[in-house]
């Protein structure tokens, strides 16, 4: 299974989603997943074992592998990214509730669907009615790809700031109701991907 997480807009939480799915997919499938990123200064270095992480230099080709892999790609959609997106089984396009980010989200979808229509949207850091409003916005713009919500919580910040995996946070009982909801939502995304892997 080749999964690409990409957005043309920096700060869209693609690396956060990549790390969460990397942990959850391995836990659920009992299979090892690798991560390939074109971010030279990625935060993933301190979170993922060296043997499972490959950083791609600016002018280096992105390898297409047949193993279970998550591509964490960002920036302008050059020929390297385009080829990776084309060869992916699923392309996840994350965004956050913001007018500027949603505009970029639409642009990202238009770029990706030229070569791959197996798109999954993730709306991260939502509060209150954000998700319903964004769903309406997407429908008004003719976007019908599967869309998942991840509520605003400390789950992801605990991973990056405290070095606590989702599993470790569960073991330590660090979750409030908002965090538990976010975990349920992240699990739903992982379950959807696993279903696609089997289908």
Report residues per predicted region:
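Walker A/P-loop NTP-binding active-site region of P-loop NTPases
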Residues: 2-58
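Switch II (G3) loop of P-loop NTPases
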Residues: 63-81
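Short, well-ordered alpha-helix to beta-strand connector turns
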Residues: 66-67, 88-89, 116
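Beta-strand-loop-alpha "switch" segments that mediate conformational coupling across diverse proteins
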Residues: 136-170
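Inter-lobe coupling/hinge region of RecA-like P-loop helicase motors
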Residues: 159-187
């Amino acid at each position: 299974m080749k999964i690409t997480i990409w957005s043309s807009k920096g700060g869209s939480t693609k690396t956060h989603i990549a790390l969460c799915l990397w942990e959850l997919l391995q836990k659920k499938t009992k299979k090892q997943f690798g991560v390939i990123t074109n971010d030279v200064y990625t935060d993933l270095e301190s979170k993922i074992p060296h043997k499972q992480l490959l950083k791609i230099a600016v002018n280096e080709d992105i390898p297409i592998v047949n193993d279970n892999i998550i591509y964490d790609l960002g920036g302008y959609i050059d020929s390297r990214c385009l080829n990776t997106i084309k060869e992916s089984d699923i392309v996840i396009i994350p965004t956050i509730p913001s007018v500027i980010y949603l505009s970029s989200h639409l642009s990202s979808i238009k770029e990706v669907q030229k070569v791959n229509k197996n798109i999954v949207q993730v709306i991260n850091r939502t509060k209150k009615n954000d998700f319903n409003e964004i769903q309406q916005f997407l429908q008004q713009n003719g976007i019908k790809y599967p869309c998942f919500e991840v509520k605003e919580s400390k789950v992801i910040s605990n991973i990056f700031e405290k070095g606590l995996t989702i599993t470790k946070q569960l073991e330590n009982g660090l979750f409030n109701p908002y965090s538990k909801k976010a975990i349920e939502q992240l699990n739903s995304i992982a379950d959807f991907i696993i279903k696609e892997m089997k289908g």
